[in-house]
Amino acid sequence: MKKIIKLLIISIIVSCGGTQETKDEVKTGYATEGFWERVGTIQIVNGVNVDTIYWDDLELETRPRQVKAYAGKHFAWLSNAGVNQPLNEDHPWKTGAGAFGTYTFDPESTNQDNMVESLTNNIGGSHLWGEGWQNLSKDNPLPVRFAATVTDKNYTQLAVRNVESDSIFGVDERTIGNTPEYAEYYEKIDETQATKIDGTWKHIANVRYINGVAVDTIGVPDGLDDHKIFHKGNVMVNFDFTKAKKGDPNWGGAGLSGKFTYKDNLLVETFNLSTGNWRATGGVWPPTPYDIEWIDDDSFVQIWKVVARQGENGELEFVENESKETNGLLHIRVK
């Protein structure tokens, strides 16, 4: 069955026009490498930091959360902040947004924008942020430019606002130094040792198992981009079903972020930030174990050991799988 799965991997890569770089071609990580949690906002006037507003100091009914992940040349971010418009049927999610793509960062640059994030996928409320956000793809990425600074513990990113549209997504040279600016302020999330599963992955197929034996493999639906970043004990998922429309339960996708452990082919994920179509009560998923079956160093199957269901109190819960059948998610490394 492993040979069949490897042939499927090759066929999917070829059909998608994708390429896999050799390990020598993979760019080493930038100083931003890792997971970062937003803790506040820095106000800047005439190029000078004048105030830092910490989210913990604000009197909010629900404290928002926003996490960014950088690994190799890929990034992802996820937020559960409320949609800043009246709730209506045009919003794919009640709260939050997220994105995935590639990025470059040049800390030595003297340009206003030393970081460029090229978005290839987006989820949640960001679908409603304008035409560029609705039509982005791997072949038509949306560049978002920042002035970024990073230390071992802190990270800030500033996108200069456009006076006419008050947008944080476009740099307008006319406003630089002439209007208050606001930088996102992050602290680094604790890390553990790197593992074999660390990296950026894409879910490309589902594998059906009976009595522990793989019997069938089916590619994911056309239009589904399901990416995952593992990095030193932290994990983030960006589930973007690009062809889902209003009324489809997958409209807007889903996003997860949290912690993981991996040892002896046992993966345990504990998501503490969930939003969109996979939002758990309180945002927290219970620890979820999986068996990992490696095809080679650049592909594995993540096999469910439990079954997800809705508990009596309406919350998501996982129970032991008593069936002879289970499913696995086939991933390939994104380089």
Please state what every model-predicted region is.
Residues K2-I10:
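Sec-dependent signal peptide recognition
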